[in-house]
């Protein structure tokens, strides 16, 4: 019962956190607000204690969030920026683990080399969800954000695999060699991607089977879609490959396989709204859980530091700043090196980095905030070695990782708005132009289809449709489509006409809705009739509002 009440409290806090953020006299990013609320609830005054199980956390929260990110990731842009993404998600992770690992070993007393590599490994993954939370959607230029999102999708796996190697060496269950580690990583990565593809393909086949035998029942199909990331993750982990990459691959496969395109309309509409709600709750839970762990981490670490002769308490805090500064320096240096390398050796087909200014490199550097994967990874480090001794400096690893997470978020909140001032984010006029061209092209195809259908119906004696009525209806529909097709030639007039028509339609829909409630209040229609007609109006209004965004 206690677990049930804890889940209810956390869900309530997540739902109210957005409201609290908006009514605050000063602006606080939602992730920081949720972390602060979590820390406040875990303080002894309130005493909300939630036991953090890293393995359960990785299974419960990470697969659906990464699946959703993979689902939303534009596959074309991801493939176009493949060199940039893998340069950050693989090469930079290796550089970070080695470089920062040696730095921690040299400057932080009491942390041996292998645990230092473990800490560097958990600090290597970046968090695109936290980044969007602290700067807002659409604030970072698209050419930068696309690469950062792809990096965050991939470096979770490379960072956790590096952590796995470091812990295995520290536990004495593995002898590290560069060749062995490379082969193991390739096996884990490629196997995870293949597992995600296969599970997603099986999901598509099962949907077609269910539609054939059980009808288009959206509830069943959405539940199966919700289970898909968990199935991908668990199956991949069971066979010894990357569950994280499997969840990402499953999400990206959904967009390319045509599963959603062939799905029934009701399923697509409900799936989108359901996933939007789940993303909000799960993202909020992640940051709330991070906040709930902070008081315990702080108390445990300070108590352990007091009895550790090699550590001064003030050194723990200065080491956080030092490690974060080193992470930023390595990241900036790597991006700068990639820029110079691209301009020098890849002149025929340069990487995106080649066109970045120093300011854009700084944005990408400070955008490398740390988040949930880092916390889950460091807390998954075992308490004891196989011989029963305590894992070396574990409390320092946990404290430093948590500190770097918070410090990276705070620095991002301060620096990114400054760097993003007066920067060109996206060419909205170009996007509107593309949308108008696409709508005009589809309208022309639709006109041809209607003309063919009109000819077929006129020739079909079994339809028994009056020719005058057939011509009148088809002409009306074709006329609406023709205006859309001609709109690309007079863009300004077309935009004004569309906006005016949308305003008229919205006004009409809202008056219809008010009248339906009046008819139900006067008992002229039943509640069932009201709900059916309201559903139709809601779909039309959602379409009109979506077009305006």
Curated annotation (Swiss-Prot):
The lineage of its organism: Bacteria, Pseudomonadati, Pseudomonadota, Gammaproteobacteria, Enterobacterales. It comes from Escherichia coli (strain K12). This is Uncharacterized Na(+)/H(+) exchanger YjcE. The keyword Cell inner membrane applies. PANTHER family: SODIUM/HYDROGEN EXCHANGER, SODIUM_HYDROGEN EXCHANGER 7. Keywords: Antiport, Cell inner membrane, Cell membrane, Ion transport, Membrane, Sodium, Sodium transport, Transmembrane, Transmembrane helix, Transport. It is found in: Cell inner membrane. GO terms for molecular function: potassium:proton antiporter activity; sodium:proton antiporter activity. Belongs to the monovalent cation:proton antiporter 1 (CPA1) transporter (TC 2.A.36) family. Pfam families: Na_H_Exchanger. One of its GO terms (cellular component) is plasma membrane. Its main location: membrane. The chain crosses the membrane at residues 1-21, 28-48, 50-70, 85-105, 106-126, 165-185, 187-207, 222-242, 278-298, 310-330, 361-381, 398-418. GO terms for biological process: potassium ion transmembrane transport; regulation of intracellular pH; sodium ion import across plasma membrane. It is a multi-pass membrane protein.
């Amino acid at each position: 019962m206690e677990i049930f009440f804890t889940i209810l409290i956390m869900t309530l806090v997540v739902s109210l956190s957005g409201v609290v953020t908006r009514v605050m006299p000063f602006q606080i990013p939602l992730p920081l607000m949720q972390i602060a609320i979590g820390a406040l609830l875990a303080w002894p005054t309130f005493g909300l204690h939630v036991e953090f199980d890293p393995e359960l956390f990785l299974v419960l929260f990470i697969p659906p969030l990464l699946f959703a990110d993979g689902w939303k990731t534009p596959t074309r842009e991801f493939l176009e920026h493949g060199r940039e993404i893998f340069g950050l998600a693989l090469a930079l992770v290796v550089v970070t683990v080695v470089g920062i690992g040696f730095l921690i070993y040299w400057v932080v007393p009491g942390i041996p080399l292998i645990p230092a590599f473990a800490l560097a490994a958990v600090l290597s993954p970046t968090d695109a969800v936290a980044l969007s939370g602290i700067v807002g959607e659409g604030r970072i230029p698209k050419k930068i954000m696309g690469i950062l999102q792809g990096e965050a999708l991939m470096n979770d796996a490379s960072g956790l695999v590096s952590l796995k190697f470091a812990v295995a060496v520290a536990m004495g269950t593995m002898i590290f060699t560069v060749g062995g580690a490379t082969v193991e990583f390739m096996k884990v990565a490629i196997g995870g991607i293949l597992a995600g593809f296969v599970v997603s393909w099986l999901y598509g086949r099962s949907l077609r089977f269910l539609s054939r035998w059980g009808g288009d029942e959206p509830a069943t199909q959405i539940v199966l879609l919700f289970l898909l990331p968990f199935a991908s993750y668990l199956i991949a982990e069971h066979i010894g490959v990357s569950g994280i990459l499997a969840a990402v691959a499953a999400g990206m496969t959904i967009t390319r396989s045509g599963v959603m395109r062939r799905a029934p309309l009701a399923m697509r509409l409900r799936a989108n709204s359901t996933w939007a709600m789940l993303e909000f709750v799960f993202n909020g839970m992640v940051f709330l859980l991070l906040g709930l762990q902070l008081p315990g981490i702080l108390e445990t670490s300070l108590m352990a530091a007091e009895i550790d002769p090699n550590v001064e308490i003030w050194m723990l805090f200065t080491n956080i700043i030092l490690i974060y500064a080193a992470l930023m320096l390595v990241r900036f240096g790597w991006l700068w090196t990639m820029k110079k390398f691209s301009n020098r050796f890849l002149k025929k087909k340069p990487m995106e980095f080649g066109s970045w200014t120093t300011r854009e490199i700084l944005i990408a550097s400070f955008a490398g905030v740390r988040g949930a994967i880092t916390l889950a990874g460091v807390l998954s480090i075992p308490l004891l070695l196989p011989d029963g001794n305590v894992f070396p400096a574990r409390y320092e690893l946990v404290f430093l990782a948590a500190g770097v997470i918070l410090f990276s978020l705070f620095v991002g909140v301060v620096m990114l708005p400054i760097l993003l001032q007066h920067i060109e984010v996206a060419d909205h006029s170009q996007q509107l132009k593309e949308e108008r061209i696409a709508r005009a092209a589809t309208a022309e195809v639709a006109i041809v289809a209607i003309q063919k259908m009109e000819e077929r119906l006129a020739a079909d004696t079994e339809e028994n449709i009056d020719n005058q009525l057939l011509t009148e209806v088809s002409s009306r529909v074709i006329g609406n489509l023709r205006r859309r097709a001609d709109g690309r030639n007079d863009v300004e007039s077309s935009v004004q006409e569309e906006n005016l028509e949308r305003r008229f339609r919205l006004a009409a829909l809202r008056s219809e809705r008010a009248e339906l409630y009046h008819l139900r209040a006067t008992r002229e229609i039943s509640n069932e009739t009201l709900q059916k007609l309201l559903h139709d109006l809601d779909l039309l209004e959602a379409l009109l509002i979506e077009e305006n965004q």
